[in-house]
Amino acid sequence: MPAEWEPHRATWISWPHHEPDWPGKLGPIPWVYAEIARVIADHETVEILCASDEIRASACEILDAHGVGRDRVRLHIVPTDRVWLRDSAPTGVLDESGDLVLLNWAFNAWAKYDNWAHDAKIGEAIAAIASCRRVEPARADGGGRIVLEGGGIEVNGNGLMLVTEEWLLSDVQVRNPGLTRADYERLFTEWLGIRQTIWLGEGCVGDDTHGHIDDVARFVDRHTVVLAVESDPRDENHARSMDNLRRLERVSRAPGIGPLRLATLPFPRAVMMNGERLPASYANFYIANGVVLVPTFNDPNDRVALNTIAELLPSHRVVGIHSVDLVWGLGTLHCLTQQEPRSRLVVSG
């Protein structure tokens, strides 16, 4: 599985339409999406799923009003339930010849929600649109397809992976009943080419996926992990982020893993809505070709996060995307995007 900073052919997003994901706040969300599309389209193709003809027409109006050039934006009619393509879209990997293969994991709405029939078919639609080979990973014990979400896996493109125990080993929102730590490590090796899996503890507070890695720890190159750390001991994220830091420090020089360089990002102050703590995290950035989109929250730490990411990814432009409204949907930039890696297949003529 290529790292996120490796070349993309395109970024896939799904146009927002499901009002219950942003109760009372759906209005501004399409305009945030237009800005995301504008920034990414300056660097690579943006493929947009629209749940209906009506939604496609509305998306076109908003994109045009926002000045989004249409030469690198394509819109497709594909029914969806929600917009979080990081989890419902397939994972792009390269086979031995360098050709792109889409791993179409089973999707069950994070073992939490009951409306996911359309999202479970997104992988088939994307594979057809992109004319890519699709494979459906299955359990070794014959128990059916593997349930996995892209927001739960983070790779360095060289055989290392970050995941959390909260996501896969907890008895809450169980994705694959009966699978053990060793089972997961074997399937990561088989399907994603992983040599070593680094297990962190918990994700961030407010994450309805129950422990996705992309809100807490990310690779920015093959040898560097950036971790979201809460320094205030009174904050709910403090203990869990310090535990994750200790785990990373322990493995940073372990054989087959290290040396790893560790960097940290702060969290913004708690973002609340109707008394609910939302999963606001700067770690939910998205790396496209030559640009990094970073969620911002009208917080003094926005500047710290933007500067830190700029230092860690000096060859990329860094663009902040206002995400206070977006995170009311319980996700931000990484959650809503899915990269399509560029094939390395060389066709001899």
PLM feature segments, named:
Residues M1-G349:
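The feature marks the mature, well-folded catalytic cores of soluble enzymes
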